[in-house]
Amino acid sequence: MKLAALFSGGKDSTYSIYKVKQMGHDVKCLVTVFPKSSDSQLLHFPAIELTKLQSKTLKISQITSTLDSNELAEEMDALKILLKRAKQDFQIEGLVHGGISSEFQKKCFEKICKENDLKIITPLWKINAKEYMNELI
């Protein structure tokens, strides 16, 4: 399946890309929303500016949006717009994200995917922390 990856540049979003590729999926683009600050409820913030370099290294196109506030509605709208663009430009059928335990994030991402008629893949959801660290190492 052709996928977009919600990409913060952290280990979880990066490893989720690796996992879905192992499953046979094709990651067509990275979707990154740059929150205004670390106060975001939905999005990862530390070192997110490095995602542009990671995109080049991974050889996967990146589409981005930069926000003026950390309001949840603005973050959700930005993701919706980027996923519509990814669907149009890359013919994606689904979204992968690296969420592990946040029910709040999972529900938000599921809602956005449902509104965009996209499947959602969460290869790290509820993974045992010890097993996960062993996989990474």
Predicted regions located by residue number:
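ATP-dependent adenylation/nucleotidyltransferase module used to activate substrates
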Residues: 1-137
